[in-house]
């Protein structure tokens, strides 16, 4: 089957549904790829790069003659007319907000897969395009805030005086929120974050931010991986928290969204008016109405007291190269599910919950919404039950047996000491102490330090190898035992270096 990559015609859209790297992966699945001329120009991918990757460059509407169409945005009306019956379209669709679009696509007797309808389950993470774009949006939000903010993010002490660090508050600790937290923290800002879901507290703290909590308990999970609408009492408590924080922080990033509903208003005009002059608010929910009452979608609005409210709706498109690569990879992972035989043909299997969730129209029949998939939150740690007190069974062994074994061991040691060389007692004492000390040292080391501990064992094994090599030329059993010692110690050395090398690779960026 042929995959077509048309040029995105939506105003200000810079992304493309495939990159040269993803084209190579599509070819390995058995597909042929046709790219409309100039489709990747705004994302820094020219036609030559696509040709080198193995794609065919086509002109005009011929790309729409492909059996599979990969796009970023939903097709326009004139593009829908170019879809042939039986074609499979994959793009962002937003079926809840676009019922007329769904009807028009169904009338063309096509199959439509919406990348915004990927189920929030672990198995579908590799094709979760919303998370990919949210990650970029959160990062870019901090970049835009830093551009508009008039000071450093990090604190400094210079000859000209002390520069205080910027204070950043992130509302919503989803993918976008965590990306914003990481970017702001890496720039040296003091970061604090709030989320209605208490289970994300550890994630926020692991990113180096302070987690803001309310003295209010309420279940925030909705069962589908998203937050739900909270009670009036909870909203009142969080609004009081935001009002207090607005007077302290310099930058606010809001990411709160509820699927299928307008974005909740979390930052009121009074809160913005109480902020310091030069402060910045980045509203990632601007496209759905915004979390701030001052937000103007697609623009920067400056209030009378000098607070800038950024309402850009194209933050992922402001990093087009990265966005296209991540989105293209999400599409490749979806096609891997559809084409398990790698023969260039796809199978829409509704027994697969991921494919069922993504497919909103199947052969002209609207199949959205898919049956809900319940997603369980991370379970709370259960309180440990008091250990049961068990009465120890009395040993039926006779006490003389233990004393007899101890006496036998003493007699055996005395006999060996009488017939062995004088140096034996010294060597045996050192050996016994080494066994005791080594046992307690190794078993009291934390599991996280076992890999670094291998460097010490490598040194000890090296000493064993040296000692064995000095004895290996004596012949007889001595040579045989020396060879065994060299073999076992060498295995420990090479294995230790291999594991240590793997550990060190985990700390490298490349």
From Swiss-Prot:
One of the record's GO cellular component terms: plasma membrane
EC number: 7.1.1.1
Main location: membrane
Localisation: Cell inner membrane
A molecular function (GO) term: NADP binding
Transmembrane region(s): 402-422, 423-443, 453-473, 477-497
Function: The transhydrogenation between NADH and NADP is coupled to respiration and ATP hydrolysis and functions as a proton pump across the membrane.
Protein's UniProt name: NAD(P) transhydrogenase subunit alpha
